[in-house]
């Protein structure tokens, strides 16, 4: 959208272009103002047949999944690289128990280059405290209506089998069971899709 273009005009244009949805974020205002704006944008996106993923913190859950199924996910958590900070494994495992209680979250899991200084983000020279398979497993554990992976395409092309695995994930899950876990320590889940 052009700067200062009215929201509804921009969303109507995306619908006309055949877009599936938008990733909306970086809203200004206090939490109450942001949540009011979130509800308005969710309604407008539904009107224009667009899914919406909120890339903003915090977008509080307000029952949107039931009323507005086009609101597929939101960043009601600390996501990877928030404030240029890679989160620790303990943060992930805590979010899996706490933040997902109210619905899907956009946490941006799935790094395949574990030293972020070598990516296009030269300003972030941190190691990702994980493994490649651990990052892929996080995409299964995190319930999200739209899995958003954060790395650059070249790194996914280096692991074609993992990219194929990510592409085959079918959400929403038909069945999800937490087999074992402790907040902040570990989680073991089983997921089943319709197939």
Region locations from a protein language model:
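Aromatic- and carboxylate-enriched substrate-binding clefts and catalytic-loop regions
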Residues: 1-131
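Short, glycine-/Ser/Thr-/acidic-enriched flexible segments
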Residues: 28-29, 59, 147-148, 194-195
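Structural beta-strand/beta-sheet cores of well-ordered domains, especially the beta-sheet scaffolds
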Residues: 48-50, 70, 103, 137-138, ...
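Short amphipathic alpha-helical patches
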Residues: 68-69, 164-165, 189
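Long hydrophobic segments that form regular secondary structure
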Residues: 117-142, 147, 192-195
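Catalytic cores of secreted or luminal carbohydrate-active enzymes
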Residues: 133-182
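Carbohydrate-binding surface patches
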Residues: 182-195
């Amino acid at each position: 959208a052009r700067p200062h273009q009215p929201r509804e005009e921009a969303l109507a244009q995306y619908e006309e272009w055949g877009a599936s949805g938008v990733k909306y974020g970086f809203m200004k205002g206090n939490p109450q103002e942001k949540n009011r704006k979130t509800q308005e944008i969710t309604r407008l996106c539904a009107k224009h047949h667009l899914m919406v993923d909120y890339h903003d913190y915090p977008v509080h859950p307000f029952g949107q999944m039931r009323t507005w199924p086009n609101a597929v996910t939101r960043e009601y958590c600390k996501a990877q690289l928030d404030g240029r900070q890679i989160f620790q494994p303990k943060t992930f495992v805590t979010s899996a128990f706490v933040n997902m209680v109210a619905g899907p979250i956009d946490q941006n899991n799935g790094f395949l280059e574990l030293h972020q200084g070598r990516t296009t983000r030269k300003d972030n020279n941190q190691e990702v405290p994980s493994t490649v398979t651990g990052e892929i497993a996080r995409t299964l554990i995190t319930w999200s209506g739209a899995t958003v992976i954060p790395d650059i395409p070249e790194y996914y092309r280096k692991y074609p089998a993992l990219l194929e695995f990510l592409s085959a994930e079918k959400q929403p899950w038909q069945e999800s069971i937490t087999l074992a876990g402790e907040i902040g320590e570990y989680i073991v889940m089983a997921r089943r899709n319709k197939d």
